[in-house]
Amino acid sequence: SKGHVRDLSTSGKFGLGVDIENHFKPKYTTIKGKKKVIDDLKKDVKKSDFVYLATDPDREGEAISWHLYDVLGLKPENYDRIVFHEITKNAVLDSFKHARKIDQDLVNSQEARRILDRIIGFRLSKLIQSKTDGKSAGRVQSVALKLIVDREREIEAFIPEEYWSVTAHFKEFDADLATYNHKKIEIHNEVEVNEVMEKLGNAFTIEKVDKKTKNKKSKAPFTTSTLQQLASNKLNMSAKKTMTIAQKLYEGIELEDETVGLITYMRTDSIRLSDEFIKNTYGFIKAKYGEDYIGYAKQAKKKDNVQDAHEGIRPTSINRTPESVRPYLSDDEFKLYRMIYYRALASLMADAKTDNTSVTLDNNNYQFKASGQVIIFDGYLKVYSDYEDTKESILPPLDTYQSKILVSNSITNEQHFTSPPARYTEAKLIKEMEELGIGRPSTYAKTIDNIRTR
């Protein structure tokens, strides 16, 4: 059907296609250009004994199946609904074993959202167009736009405040002034910083050295929103571009003599992985990196607004490495697939381990602090270091110093000013929308694109 075949009409009161006075009953009409699609499908149905509806495995897909059921005149006894989350031979064949009927609750959910979109969006858009140069408004779009406007007003109202930092420079590391008599110190101007500098000498006493071994856990597999956020931050891809490329990776790439779906369905709130994928990945990790690198699957914390009907976004086969499919992908397809692949792989690998050292130095009751981190077991970072900050900062073994006195090479100070809140990047706006429960994963890209273009 190539997507939706019907939508709300623009007839009736306010052109909503919704009978507000009759229990909000919707009136549907065929989408322009879809009459031929429907006619062709009707011919195919007449030649068939049984019909399988295999639209996308989400709310919109369920609604499309329902509309097709209606316009094609299907009967309960001559159709089934099948669902798969990856376009692979095994997944498609397995879906026939779990065939079901249309989930009317999902359909009703989609219909309610669409009606709300129309009631709010249509009427608000017309009001805005009559009063301003605005192009459109919407149930999700307008709230997201308010976030952007509120942030801009914060920036405009922001008044910078002066502050100063003081740093002691030693042969192998630097330490920053943190406290005075172990209470947080704030230096507001040049007069105050000069008073501090006058009291400091070059000799520092090692007051305390703390050493801890910490575990650094890998992140869960991608959801729609986390994929869009990291693609924006690391690959400089817009949400729209990310979803376009992900759609292609999901639908299939030509690999030699076959078309293969490389990733699972990319509109999802879930971080779950199938038992089969976990088992295969554990075997892959053991064979390639060793048993010490095997981790455990992430468990989601249940949120009220999360729909956990699917898996997280992952490669359809852990054996199909990014390097093995590189010749068949464009540069952007390769970059996105590589990020999805290694995120899923890393999520099932062992924690990284770091030795963390912090030192407190005293100079005339002023305490300076420095910290260092060394990776002692790379764990999941063996495959995921390109996407996380893994910079090491090494401190000398200060706890073994015979003398408790260190002499600095120099002590410097620097003027700073507080910064206004940053404007939203696409990644930060998506994160904020998700945390506030604004919109759905499937709407983020379109919402942001509308705001950007209109």
Please identify what each model-predicted range represents.
Residues 1-114, 120, 181, 409:
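Intrinsically disordered, low-complexity regulatory segments
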Residues 2-30, 137-251, 283-298, 302-304, ...:
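Long, highly charged, low-complexity internal segments
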Residues 27-29, 55-57, 74-80, 99-107, ...:
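Short, polar/flexible loop-turn hinges at active-site or ligand-entry regions and domain interfaces
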Residues 33, 39-40, 66, 87-170, ...:
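C-terminal or mid-to-C-terminal helical accessory/interaction module adjacent to the motor/catalytic core
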Residues 40, 44, 63-71, 91-95, ...:
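Alpha-helical scaffold elements adjacent to nucleotide-binding pockets in ATP/GTP-utilizing enzyme cores
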Residues 78-81, 105, 260-266, 355:
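Interdomain boundary/hinge elements
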Residues 85-90, 224-225, 245-254, 258-267, ...:
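Short, conserved phosphate-binding/catalytic loop or strand-edge motifs used
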Residues 259-285, 446-454:
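Accessory beta->alpha helical hairpin/"wing" motif in late/C-terminal subdomains of nucleic-acid enzymes
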